[in-house]
Each structure stands twice: as structure tokens, then as C-alpha cells.
Amino acid sequence: MKFLMKKCVRCGRYTFKDVCPVCNGQTTVPHPPRFSPEDKYVKYRVLAKLTKERPSSEGSTLSS
């Protein structure tokens, strides 16, 4: 599925272009992925999101 609308990472404006016309920042798709209760990889996405938000100076290791 192709999404038309994109959101600028820098300024947060919405546009239809790949580069923001206001600040020349990179744009991404603002829509979340589709939810499926049978998703096998949700564990890995949540883990990646949590480690991305957590400061790396803690030095803790995550195990499954």
C-alpha cells in the first residue's frame, strides 16, 4: 500500500513530497503499520523501540 502523505522529521509539517519544502528535512510515513493478532515479529519491534528510547549509557542487556 502506497501512502501519499508524509511527515517531516525535523519540523513536523505534513507534505506530499519526499523532502520537506520548508526545512529540507527528511519525510517519513506517519501512519502506523497494520495490526495483526497473529504477528510473529511484534516482540522484536517492541524490543527495538524500547531500546531506541532508552539511553545507551545504562549498559543493561535485554534477554528474551
UniProtKB/Swiss-Prot annotation:
Disulfide bridge positions per record: none
GO molecular function: snoRNA binding
Pfam families linked to this entry: Nop10p (PF04135)
Alphabetically ordered keywords of this record: Ribonucleoprotein, Ribosome biogenesis, rRNA processing
Keyword Manganese among record annotations: no
Highest taxon listed in the record's lineage: Archaea
UniProt key word rRNA processing: yes
One GO cellular component, as annotated: ribonucleoprotein complex
A biological process from GO: pseudouridine synthesis
Its job: Involved in ribosome biogenesis; more specifically in 18S rRNA pseudouridylation and in cleavage of pre-rRNA.
Family membership noted in the UniProt record: Belongs to the NOP10 family.
HAMAP family on file: Nop10
UniProt name for this protein: Ribosome biogenesis protein Nop10
